[in-house]
Amino acid sequence: MKKLLKSVLVFAALSSASSLQALPVGNPAEPSLMIDGILWEGFGGDPCDPCTTWCDAISMRMGYYGDFVFDRVLKTDVNKEFQMGDKPTSTTGNATAPTTLTARENPAYGRHMQDAEMFTNAACMALNIWDRFDVFCTLGASSGYLKGNSASFNLVGLFGDNENQSTVKTNSVPNMSLDQSVVELYTDTAFSWSVGARAALWECGCATLGASFQYAQSKPKVEELNVLCNAAEFTINKPKGYVGQEFPLALIAGTDAATGTKDASIDYHEWQASLALSYRLNMFTPYIGVKWSRASFDADTIRIAQPKSATAIFDTTTLNPTIAGAGDVKASAEGQLGDTMQIVSLQLNKMKSRKSCGIAVGTTIVDADKYAVTVETRLIDERAAHVNAQFRF
């Protein structure tokens, strides 16, 4: 049985290096791996000894914490209906732009994100009790990247407007949902933190069964937003938008004169509980574990308008291409705006974990009972890699 357990854990630890996958599980035996310190010797006494003090029971560890999520499995968390203008029904020509909101099927409902990445570099500190329990925290910086179909971001615009003017009316609302495009965003590097606890619950020889619980938070701002759409392609550096604002947006939305906007930021929260089994083989301690986690990314459903000119230049305010192929702008004529997408905007919808369960595989290398390096990979609910290097005082 021992040989079988050794074989399974060693194979899992070595195979993890070939496939990488925001919170690590960690080695369940970590509280008891480093039993000596670089400044103070470890205490191996009996906790039930009446002569033992808390000074003998407590120790500190510090080190580097790196967590790199290459693909988090996320989906949108939105309502089934979305308020915008009626669908166009005219078979030819243009039509009067809608001015009232209608409840339509939300194209963002249940959408899966194509890519979600997060990279964290931090310092970690752990308070150890009786070489069995850890209470730890991390302080560092995180950055992220999100990519998805434009429908996930409710990219909308107005098409077929029959007005005789260089801009739409103030009460016009979008009537087209653009779902054949891609939206991606990059965040800046922002402060992040996490707290947690880990315990070695059961030990038998060299095997250890342990559990942990963690919580993490960060709130990075959106550094760059790219909309890759044939009908309305644009890029915004440090985008700003409207929170809690229904259609229609002000006509100055997207211009330098826009007011009432705020910076786009993403509030990231995650909690995780895990259970893992390890087996010590001299200086190597491979482990395998399962985890249950929930993550959310909330941007307050901020709506961001396409950048445009405050005043018309050559009778246009954006560089959106013609769609039906008119080829020119007919000034002072009906339908001069009908062949281009107008009042384009998108919103950053709330996202959450699409899968709650995952597995983690890793190994820890211990040197002189004072230093340790842990390498871990996580799969199923995310593809991530974790590196942890620490020492005991």
Swiss-Prot record:
Q: What is its main location?
A: membrane
Q: Keywords on this record? A: Cell outer membrane, Cell shape, Disulfide bond, Ion transport, Membrane, Porin, Signal, Transmembrane, Transmembrane beta strand, Transport
List this protein's GO terms for biological process: monoatomic ion transport; regulation of cell shape
Signal peptide from the UniProt entry: 1-22
Q: Does the keyword Amino-acid biosynthesis apply?
A: no
Q: Does the keyword Kinase apply?
A: no
Source domain of life: Bacteria
Q: Where in the cell is it found?
A: Cell outer membrane
Cellular component terms per the entry's GO annotation = cell outer membrane; pore complex
**What is the recorded membrane topology of this protein?**
Multi-pass membrane protein
Per its record, what are the GO molecular function terms?
Answer: porin activity; structural molecule activity
| Task of the protein | In elementary bodies (EBs, the infectious stage, which is able to survive outside the host cell) provides the structural integrity of the outer envelope through disulfide cross-links with the small cysteine-rich protein and the large cysteine-rich periplasmic protein. It has been described in publications as the Sarkosyl-insoluble COMC (Chlamydia outer membrane complex), and serves as the functional equivalent of peptidoglycan. Permits diffusion of specific solutes through the outer membrane.
Q: Which family does it belong to?
A: Belongs to the chlamydial porin (CP) (TC 1.B.2) family.
Question: Subunit comment for this entry?
Answer: Part of a disulfide cross-linked outer membrane complex (COMC) composed of the major outer membrane porin (MOMP), the small cysteine-rich protein (OmcA) and the large cysteine-rich periplasmic protein (OmcB).
Descriptive protein name = Major outer membrane porin, serovar E
* Organism listed in the record: Chlamydia trachomatis
The taxonomic lineage of its organism, from the top, reads: Bacteria, Pseudomonadati, Chlamydiota, Chlamydiia, Chlamydiales
